[in-house]
Amino acid sequence: MAKIVDIKGREVLDSRGNPTVEADVLLDNGIIGSACAPSGASTGSREALELRDGDKSRYLGKGVLKAVANINGPIRDLLLGKDPADQKALDRAMIELDGTENKAKLGANAILAVSLAAAKAAAQDLDLPLYAHIANLNGTPGQYSMPVPMMNIINGGEHADNNVDIQEFMVQPVGAKTFSDGLRMGTEIFHHLKAVLKARGLNTAVGDEGGFAPNLASNEDALGAIAEAVEKAGYKLGTDVTLALDCAASEFYEDGKYNLSGEGKSFDAEGFADYLKGLTERFPIISIEDGLDESDWAGWKILTDKIGEKVQLVGDDLFVTNTKILKEGIEKGIGNSILIKFNQIGSLTETLEAIQMAKAAGYTAVISHRSGETEDSTIADLAVGTAAGQIKTGSLCRSDRVSKYNQLLRIEEQLGAKAVYRGRAEFRG
C-alpha cells in the first residue's frame, strides 16, 4: 500500500488569465498525481468559498497564494503518510481541518486540487484508468457510459460581451450512435454556425467557453441561427440533434423580476416560466438550466409543474452540488436534475455523494466544467466513471474545452465495445 510522502501546491493560470490552484500529490513509490481547480463567473451564492488573496497589487486581487500556502502547510502536514486510495478519509480529514460550512478557512480551491490529485495518484498506483478508480469510489465498479455532450455554441450573459441575456445555447447530438460520432456532429454544426453568422454580417469571435458571441435580436434569434446551422450540416433538428439552454437567470433577476435587457422585456416568475415554455414549444429544447433565480423556489416550482414532465430542469446555482440543498429540492419537487461542479462543493467525495443522491431520487446528473478552466480533464473521467450520461464542457474550440472532449475520445477507444452511448435515452420526455 502506497503512502503520501509529499504534497505541493502552486499558483497557475486558468483560461481567463486568472490565477488558480494546482496541487501535486507524491507517493513513496515515485507516483505523482496532479490536478487544477477551475473557477466560475456566474456563481451560486451558496457555493463553497474559492479563497483568493485580495491583494490588489498582484493579479488585481485574484492571486491564490493563501490557498497554495494552505496546501503546502496544514493540508500537507495532515495527509503525510496517509493512503491515497482512501479518498473518503482524505477528504473528510481536510473538511474537518477546515471546520467551516463553506470551506472558507482553507479554501475549496485548495481542498479540491488536493482531493483530485490524490485520486489521480491512487488510480496510477492501482494501475487503473482514472474513470475506473472513480467508478470504484462511487460503488459502481465497471458501470460506465459515454456522456451525451451539451455543446455550448452560442455564448451570452456573463460568458460574453454581447447583448444576449441567456448565457448558453447548446446542441446535443442525441441521435448519434457513439460519443465520437456525436462529437463530430457537434463540430460540423459549430463550423456551419460560423458560416451562418458570417453570412448575416455578425461577429464570430468566441466567448469564455468557446461559443460564438455575436449581438443578436433576441434569444429566439440565437436559436434560429443554430437551427439553420443544424440543417446546413445535414442533420434533423429534434431527431439527430436537440437543444439546451443555460439561462443563468440569477444574473438578470432583480426585485422579483426577470429582466431581458437585450430584448427590452421584463417578467415575473410565472411570466418567465411561460416565456421558457413557449421556447420549448417552438424549438426542440429538452434541457433548461437555471431557468429561474436560485432564491426563487416558488418560481422554480411553477416552472417544474409547467414543463418538468417533458423537459430536463437543471439546478446549478440552485443546488450548487450540495446534498443538503439538493435534498430539500427533491422533497419540494423543485427541478429534476442537478449540475455537478467539483468546485461548488470542494471535494471528490462530496461530488460523488451529490451524484448518488440525485440518481436515487430519479434526478439526472449533468457533469460540468466552469467558465474559468484549465487543461485538467478530470471531469471527462468523472462523467464516464459515474455513468452520469451527460457532460457540459463548452464549445468545439479553445483547448481548455477540447481537452475534455479529447480525453473522452481516448476513454471511448479504451472501453471499446463497453463504450455505451445512450443518446436521447439520457433525457426526460
Curated annotation (Swiss-Prot):
Q: What is this enzyme's catalytic activity, as reactions? A: (2R)-2-phosphoglycerate = phosphoenolpyruvate + H2O
Residues binding Mg(2+), per UniProt: 246, 289, 316
- NCBIfam families on file: eno
Q: What is this protein called?
A: Enolase
**Which catalytic residues are annotated?**
209, 341
Q: What is its EC number?
A: 4.2.1.11
Q: SUPFAM superfamilies this protein is in?
A: Enolase C-terminal domain-like (SSF51604), Enolase N-terminal domain-like (SSF54826)
Cofactor entry = Mg(2+)
Q: Which Gene3D superfamilies match?
A: Enolase-like C-terminal domain, Enolase-like, N-terminal domain
Q: Which PANTHER family match?
A: ENOLASE
UniProt function note: Catalyzes the reversible conversion of 2-phosphoglycerate (2-PG) into phosphoenolpyruvate (PEP). It is essential for the degradation of carbohydrates via glycolysis.
> What is the taxonomic lineage of the source species?
Bacteria, Pseudomonadati, Pseudomonadota, Gammaproteobacteria, Pseudomonadales
What does the record give as its pathway? Carbohydrate degradation; glycolysis; pyruvate from D-glyceraldehyde 3-phosphate: step 4/5
Q: Name one Pfam family in it.
A: Enolase_C
Its subunit composition reads: Component of the RNA degradosome, a multiprotein complex involved in RNA processing and mRNA degradation.
Where is this gene product found? Cytoplasm; Secreted; Cell surface
- Native organism is Pseudomonas entomophila (strain L48)
One GO MF annotation is: phosphopyruvate hydratase activity
Cofactor descriptive note: Binds a second Mg(2+) ion via substrate during catalysis.
